[in-house]
Amino acid sequence: MAFTFKQFHIDDFGCGMPVSTDAVILGAWAPLSDAQNILDIGAGSGLLSLMATQRSNAKVTSIELDDTAVNACQKNFEASPWTSRLTVKHSSVQEFSKQHQESEESLFDHIICNPPYFKGGTQSQNRLRAQARHTDTLDFCALLEAIGSLLAPNGTASLILPSQSMSEFGLVLADSSLEFSQVTDISDSQRKTPHRHLFTLCHKSTDASAKPNEGATEHFCIKELDGSYTEEMKLLITGFYLKY
Protein backbone atom coordinates (compact mmCIF):
# COMPACT_ATOMS: atom_id res chain seq x y z
CA MET A 1 0.00 0.00 0.00
CA ALA A 2 1.19 3.52 -0.75
CA PHE A 3 1.16 6.44 1.69
CA THR A 4 1.87 10.06 0.90
CA PHE A 5 3.17 12.27 3.68
CA LYS A 6 3.86 16.00 3.47
CA GLN A 7 7.47 15.67 2.31
CA PHE A 8 7.86 12.07 1.17
CA HIS A 9 6.06 9.03 -0.19
CA ILE A 10 6.10 5.46 1.15
CA ASP A 11 5.26 2.27 -0.72
CA ASP A 12 5.32 -0.67 1.70
CA PHE A 13 4.25 -3.35 -0.79
CA GLY A 14 5.85 -6.67 0.16
CA CYS A 15 7.06 -5.46 3.56
CA GLY A 16 6.30 -7.61 6.59
CA MET A 17 5.37 -4.65 8.77
CA PRO A 18 3.21 -2.08 6.98
CA VAL A 19 3.05 1.61 7.85
CA SER A 20 1.36 1.93 11.24
CA THR A 21 0.28 4.59 13.71
CA ASP A 22 2.82 3.18 16.17
CA ALA A 23 5.67 3.78 13.75
CA VAL A 24 4.49 7.30 12.90
CA ILE A 25 4.24 8.20 16.59
CA LEU A 26 7.72 6.81 17.29
CA GLY A 27 9.23 8.60 14.30
CA ALA A 28 7.66 11.92 15.30
CA TRP A 29 8.43 11.56 19.03
CA ALA A 30 12.08 10.41 19.04
CA PRO A 31 14.42 13.17 20.33
CA LEU A 32 16.60 13.80 17.27
CA SER A 33 17.41 17.51 17.45
CA ASP A 34 21.16 17.07 18.00
CA ALA A 35 21.62 13.80 16.15
CA GLN A 36 24.23 13.64 13.39
CA ASN A 37 24.52 9.89 12.82
CA ILE A 38 21.33 7.81 13.16
CA LEU A 39 20.77 4.05 12.88
CA ASP A 40 17.36 2.55 12.05
CA ILE A 41 17.21 -1.11 13.12
CA GLY A 42 14.74 -3.19 11.12
CA ALA A 43 13.91 -0.40 8.70
CA GLY A 44 11.16 -2.16 6.73
CA SER A 45 9.85 0.28 4.13
CA GLY A 46 12.09 3.03 5.51
CA LEU A 47 9.39 5.09 7.23
CA LEU A 48 11.34 5.80 10.43
CA SER A 49 14.49 6.63 8.45
CA LEU A 50 12.64 9.10 6.26
CA MET A 51 10.95 10.73 9.25
CA ALA A 52 14.32 11.00 11.00
CA THR A 53 15.90 12.58 7.93
CA GLN A 54 13.06 15.10 7.65
CA ARG A 55 13.38 16.04 11.33
CA SER A 56 17.17 16.38 11.48
CA ASN A 57 20.30 17.09 9.47
CA ALA A 58 21.69 13.66 10.29
CA LYS A 59 22.91 10.91 8.04
CA VAL A 60 20.75 7.81 8.51
CA THR A 61 21.86 4.20 8.10
CA SER A 62 19.01 1.71 7.78
CA ILE A 63 19.48 -2.02 8.28
CA GLU A 64 16.93 -4.59 7.16
CA LEU A 65 17.08 -8.38 7.04
CA ASP A 66 14.45 -9.09 4.38
CA ASP A 67 15.48 -8.56 0.75
CA THR A 68 11.97 -7.52 -0.39
CA ALA A 69 11.83 -4.81 2.27
CA VAL A 70 15.36 -3.69 1.39
CA ASN A 71 14.29 -3.11 -2.22
CA ALA A 72 11.18 -1.19 -1.13
CA CYS A 73 13.24 0.85 1.30
CA GLN A 74 15.81 1.74 -1.35
CA LYS A 75 13.11 2.85 -3.80
CA ASN A 76 11.45 5.01 -1.15
CA PHE A 77 14.80 6.60 -0.33
CA GLU A 78 15.56 7.33 -3.97
CA ALA A 79 12.17 9.02 -4.37
CA SER A 80 12.75 11.28 -1.35
CA PRO A 81 14.42 14.72 -1.15
CA TRP A 82 17.19 13.34 1.10
CA THR A 83 18.76 10.55 -0.97
CA SER A 84 22.31 11.67 -0.19
CA ARG A 85 21.76 11.28 3.56
CA LEU A 86 20.11 7.85 3.45
CA THR A 87 21.80 4.44 3.22
CA VAL A 88 20.15 1.02 3.46
CA LYS A 89 22.11 -2.14 4.23
CA HIS A 90 20.84 -5.71 3.75
CA SER A 91 21.89 -7.31 7.03
CA SER A 92 20.82 -8.63 10.40
CA VAL A 93 21.59 -6.27 13.26
CA GLN A 94 23.86 -8.92 14.77
CA GLU A 95 26.01 -9.16 11.63
CA PHE A 96 25.94 -5.39 11.11
CA SER A 97 27.10 -4.81 14.68
CA LYS A 98 29.97 -7.27 14.27
CA GLN A 99 31.13 -5.74 10.98
CA HIS A 100 30.75 -2.20 12.32
CA GLN A 101 32.97 -2.94 15.31
CA GLU A 102 35.60 -4.67 13.15
CA SER A 103 35.77 -1.69 10.78
CA GLU A 104 36.05 0.74 13.74
CA GLU A 105 33.49 3.08 12.18
CA SER A 106 31.93 5.90 14.20
CA LEU A 107 29.22 4.96 16.68
CA PHE A 108 25.67 6.26 16.34
CA ASP A 109 24.42 9.12 18.50
CA HIS A 110 20.83 8.00 18.01
CA ILE A 111 19.30 4.59 17.29
CA ILE A 112 15.62 4.15 16.46
CA CYS A 113 13.74 0.86 16.35
CA ASN A 114 10.19 -0.49 16.21
CA PRO A 115 11.21 -4.00 17.30
CA PRO A 116 9.51 -7.38 16.93
CA TYR A 117 7.79 -8.30 20.18
CA PHE A 118 5.74 -11.51 19.83
CA LYS A 119 7.40 -14.50 21.47
CA GLY A 120 6.20 -17.98 20.52
CA GLY A 121 2.52 -18.57 19.84
CA THR A 122 0.82 -18.78 16.48
CA GLN A 123 2.62 -16.87 13.78
CA SER A 124 1.10 -15.19 10.77
CA GLN A 125 1.00 -17.33 7.61
CA ASN A 126 2.67 -14.38 5.91
CA ARG A 127 6.38 -15.16 6.40
CA LEU A 128 7.48 -11.54 6.14
CA ARG A 129 4.88 -10.32 8.62
CA ALA A 130 5.78 -13.11 11.05
CA GLN A 131 9.46 -12.18 10.79
CA ALA A 132 8.72 -8.51 11.42
CA ARG A 133 6.47 -9.14 14.43
CA HIS A 134 8.04 -12.14 16.20
CA THR A 135 11.30 -12.22 18.16
CA ASP A 136 12.59 -15.40 16.49
CA THR A 137 15.10 -13.46 14.37
CA LEU A 138 15.81 -10.70 16.91
CA ASP A 139 15.06 -11.24 20.59
CA PHE A 140 15.35 -8.53 23.24
CA CYS A 141 18.73 -9.77 24.47
CA ALA A 142 20.29 -9.63 20.99
CA LEU A 143 18.67 -6.27 20.29
CA LEU A 144 19.97 -4.66 23.49
CA GLU A 145 23.42 -6.14 22.98
CA ALA A 146 23.55 -4.62 19.49
CA ILE A 147 22.27 -1.24 20.66
CA GLY A 148 24.80 -1.23 23.49
CA SER A 149 27.69 -1.87 21.11
CA LEU A 150 26.57 0.57 18.40
CA LEU A 151 25.40 3.51 20.54
CA ALA A 152 27.84 6.34 21.24
CA PRO A 153 28.70 6.98 24.94
CA ASN A 154 26.29 9.92 25.17
CA GLY A 155 23.84 8.56 22.61
CA THR A 156 20.15 7.75 22.92
CA ALA A 157 17.97 4.97 21.51
CA SER A 158 14.22 5.36 20.92
CA LEU A 159 11.83 2.39 20.81
CA ILE A 160 8.16 1.49 21.15
CA LEU A 161 6.64 -1.68 22.63
CA PRO A 162 3.19 -2.96 23.61
CA SER A 163 2.32 -3.14 27.31
CA GLN A 164 2.46 -6.94 27.43
CA SER A 165 6.13 -6.90 26.39
CA MET A 166 7.44 -4.30 28.83
CA SER A 167 7.91 -6.62 31.81
CA GLU A 168 10.10 -9.07 29.89
CA PHE A 169 11.96 -6.22 28.21
CA GLY A 170 12.66 -4.62 31.59
CA LEU A 171 14.14 -7.85 32.94
CA VAL A 172 16.45 -8.20 29.95
CA LEU A 173 17.35 -4.51 30.13
CA ALA A 174 18.41 -4.87 33.78
CA ASP A 175 21.13 -7.31 32.70
CA SER A 176 22.33 -5.13 29.83
CA SER A 177 24.62 -2.10 29.60
CA LEU A 178 21.63 0.19 29.04
CA GLU A 179 18.85 1.78 31.10
CA PHE A 180 15.63 3.72 30.62
CA SER A 181 16.07 7.49 30.38
CA GLN A 182 12.50 8.44 29.44
CA VAL A 183 9.18 6.60 29.24
CA THR A 184 5.90 7.79 27.72
CA ASP A 185 2.74 5.70 28.09
CA ILE A 186 0.32 5.78 25.15
CA SER A 187 -3.46 5.38 25.46
CA ASP A 188 -5.97 5.22 22.63
CA SER A 189 -8.31 7.50 24.62
CA GLN A 190 -8.64 8.95 28.11
CA ARG A 191 -10.87 6.08 29.20
CA LYS A 192 -8.45 3.37 28.15
CA THR A 193 -5.35 2.11 29.90
CA PRO A 194 -1.98 2.50 28.14
CA HIS A 195 -1.43 -0.09 25.41
CA ARG A 196 1.92 1.10 24.04
CA HIS A 197 5.04 2.61 25.58
CA LEU A 198 7.56 4.93 23.97
CA PHE A 199 10.92 5.05 25.67
CA THR A 200 14.50 6.13 25.29
CA LEU A 201 17.55 4.21 26.43
CA CYS A 202 21.05 5.37 27.31
CA HIS A 203 24.21 3.76 28.61
CA LYS A 204 24.20 3.07 32.35
CA SER A 205 26.09 5.68 34.34
CA THR A 206 28.23 4.96 37.39
CA ASP A 207 27.65 8.54 38.53
CA ALA A 208 24.53 8.55 40.73
CA SER A 209 23.99 12.28 40.16
CA ALA A 210 23.92 11.72 36.40
CA LYS A 211 21.34 8.95 36.46
CA PRO A 212 18.07 9.66 34.60
CA ASN A 213 14.88 10.19 36.55
CA GLU A 214 13.65 6.62 36.42
CA GLY A 215 10.37 7.51 38.14
CA ALA A 216 9.35 10.06 35.52
CA THR A 217 6.72 8.65 33.17
CA GLU A 218 4.77 10.86 30.81
CA HIS A 219 1.37 10.08 29.31
CA PHE A 220 0.16 10.56 25.74
CA CYS A 221 -3.41 10.14 24.51
CA ILE A 222 -4.11 9.57 20.80
CA LYS A 223 -7.84 10.24 20.53
CA GLU A 224 -10.62 12.23 22.16
CA LEU A 225 -13.75 10.42 23.33
CA ASP A 226 -15.45 11.29 20.03
CA GLY A 227 -12.70 9.50 18.08
CA SER A 228 -10.94 12.61 16.78
CA TYR A 229 -7.24 13.14 17.39
CA THR A 230 -6.22 14.98 20.56
CA GLU A 231 -4.41 18.29 20.22
CA GLU A 232 -1.16 16.68 21.39
CA MET A 233 -1.48 14.02 18.69
CA LYS A 234 -2.18 16.66 16.04
CA LEU A 235 0.84 18.64 17.20
CA LEU A 236 3.03 15.54 17.05
CA ILE A 237 2.07 14.55 13.49
CA THR A 238 1.57 18.01 11.98
CA GLY A 239 4.82 17.80 10.03
CA PHE A 240 3.81 14.53 8.37
CA TYR A 241 0.08 13.95 7.88
CA LEU A 242 -1.43 15.84 4.96
CA LYS A 243 -4.59 16.64 6.94
CA TYR A 244 -2.80 18.55 9.70
Curated annotation (Swiss-Prot):
Role this protein plays? Specifically methylates the adenine in position 37 of tRNA(1)(Val) (anticodon cmo5UAC).
Q: Which UniProt keywords apply?
A: Cytoplasm, Methyltransferase, S-adenosyl-L-methionine, Transferase, tRNA processing
Task: Kindly list the places in or outside the cell where this protein is found, as annotated in its UniProt entry.
Answer: Cytoplasm
- Entries under SUPFAM superfamilies matching the protein: S-adenosyl-L-methionine-dependent methyltransferases
Domain of life of the source = Bacteria
Describe the reaction catalysed, as an equation. Answer: adenosine(37) in tRNA1(Val) + S-adenosyl-L-methionine = N(6)-methyladenosine(37) in tRNA1(Val) + S-adenosyl-L-homocysteine + H(+)
Q: Which family does it belong to?
A: Belongs to the methyltransferase superfamily. tRNA (adenine-N(6)-)-methyltransferase family.
Q: Which GO terms describe its molecular function?
A: nucleic acid binding; rRNA (adenine-N6,N6-)-dimethyltransferase activity; tRNA (adenine-N6)-methyltransferase activity
**What's this protein's name?**
tRNA1(Val) (adenine(37)-N6)-methyltransferase
InterPro entries hit by this protein: DNA_methylase_N6_adenine_CS (IPR002052), rRNA_Ade_Mease_Trfase_CS (IPR020596), SAM-dependent_MTases_sf (IPR029063), Small_mtfrase_dom (IPR007848), tRNA_Adenine-N(6)_MTase (IPR050210), tRNA_adenine-N6_MeTrfase (IPR022882)
Principal EC category: transferase
What EC number(s) does the entry state?
Answer: 2.1.1.223
